């Protein structure tokens, strides 16, 4: 049985409840970082002022598992509470030997006092190729964090979700 140590200022105890015999490799759902991209907001438009709902298109370049890629994403964001946005969108990654991977994504964004929005969410990838440098993305879920600053600059990091 695997046990964990819980440490408090005046108390130390061992408890099998936390690990329950689960191998440590199965407890970590966040896999390796598979991508890092930087780019720019290309355009925005208001879809509905009674929400409001805004459509945003981003264009980024970077690397996905060592392959240079270009990413284009269009998403719709709308406020769900004070300072919090919900976004849903679609994207395309192009790289390698004319390879392409598509994805659907969903995220929550938090608006900072500086005007930037920090997004946390997931991409659900699909490819039609079984070979090539982006083929590994087929049916992969990638969790991401992205930031769009007040000037429209975008940074994004993606990890595989095991």
Stretches found by the model and what they are:
Residues 8-162:
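Beta-strand-enriched cores of mature, soluble protein domains
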